Design a protein with these regions (language model features):
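Donor nucleotide-sugar binding/catalytic pocket of nucleotide-sugar-dependent glycosyltransferases
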Residues: 117-132, 136-152
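Acidic donor-binding loop of glycosyltransferase active sites
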Residues: 245-260, 273
């Protein structure tokens, strides 16, 4: 059994947070990895901005304001540059990043990385290409996220859902573009179709607060399009999200160069929801083009693929079954094993 310490100084959350409401991707990843490592027999402590000390599913959640230990077998610093130098006598230090690594060029990151030389862990092949080759480090590892077990065991649907598309990502990542396309091309071709949006700043904590006005403008526009089948609602906790995805026929998401994993599409695909996107950022890693969804090269082909999946039952079923077969294999236990290999 190894002693594993994880530190995060972002938003306030703990192991019970996914059960209480929607949670950002990086935060959900910390919870899932910590629990998977405990499941593999390790002692895991998470030091973060949780409201109070808590043990949940075997993971010790401890307010970081009280300090961190000096030693561990594996220390995982999550995102923040101030965390890199903590737990100084850890046998192996890891810097786990989730956003494109361009920001690591900032002097405060370069200095902290130069002093500690941790292994930088990226969450996908595209993500790894954003790490500058000259960046000080003790190694570079690619460890994709796993999928929560709730997403990995869906059965094939007996009949297709109604012509309902769903969007569950950051509204600043292409939702305006999608609303344009919905109004100009998709809805006119299929007036009975609906676009259900579950998005908002609450998922992103303080970062969402800083972007709340910009998000609100896009979401207000979505609400104004109710007459053409657009339904705008709040982000959903996990159980309700799974239900909404299973009742949707296709996930529509343009993609973004800042998308390093895209849990929204990964979860939809694992549940058998075909997806239409463009080949931006990590989206080619999430969709098997022409098999579990479509990677559209332009707006016209995006609209055509969307309409086809909303309308054509045979096309939908083929991609639905392929997604169930091919897109739900990687678990958080798999990801935990990859982190285990970093322990000296």
């Amino acid at each position: 059994m190894a002693r594993i310490v994880i530190a995060d100084d972002g938003v306030s959350f703990d192991g019970s947070s996914p059960e209480a409401g929607p949670l950002g991707g990086a935060e959900a990843a910390v919870v899932a990895l910590a629990e998977a490592l405990v499941g593999r027999g390790h002692s895991v402590e998470v030091y973060n901005r949780c409201a109070a000390r808590l043990t949940h599913k075997g993971v010790a959640w401890i307010p970081i304001s009280g300090g961190t230990p000096s030693s561990a077998d594996l220390y995982i610093a999550n995102r923040g540059h101030r965390l890199i130098g903590l737990v100084p006598r850890a046998r192996r230090a890891v810097f786990w990043i989730h956003n494109p690594a361009w920001y690591l060029k900032k002097p405060r990151y370069v200095w902290a990385l130069w002093r500690r030389r941790p292994v930088i862990v990226c969450i996908g092949a595209y993500h790894a290409t954003t790490v500058p080759g000259w960046m000080p480090r003790g190694g570079l590892a690619v460890i994709p996220y796993g999928l929560a077990e709730e997403f990995r065991h869906a059965e094939p649907l007996a009949s297709p859902p109604p012509p309902r598309a769903i969007f569950t990502s950051n509204p600043q990542r292409g939702l305006d573009w999608l609303l344009d396309l919905w109004g100009i091309s998709i809805h006119p071709a299929l007036p009975e179709a609906e676009l259900h949006i579950h998005a908002g700043p609450a998922v992103y904590g303080e970062a969402g607060g800083r972007q709340a006005a910009a998000m609100a403008a896009v979401l207000e526009r979505a609400r104004s399009m109710e007459s053409i089948g657009v339904c705008c609602a709040q982000p959903l906790p996990r159980a309700a999200l799974i239900k909404a995805l299973r009742e949707s026929r296709v996930m529509l998401y343009r993609g973004d160069e800042n998308e390093t994993f895209c849990a929204a599409v990964a979860e939809a695909q694992a549940l058998g929801v075909p997806a239409v996107a463009q080949p931006l950022g990590s989206l080619p890693e999430r969709i098997v083009d022409g098999v579990t969804g479509e990677l559209a090269v332009d707006a016209a082909s995006f609209a055509a693929s969307s309409v086809a999946l909303l309308r054509d039952d045979e096309r939908w079923r083929r991609m639905h079954l392929a997604a169930l077969e091919r897109q739900r294999g990687r678990s958080w236990d798999d990801a935990a094993q990859s982190f285990e290999r970093l322990i000296p």
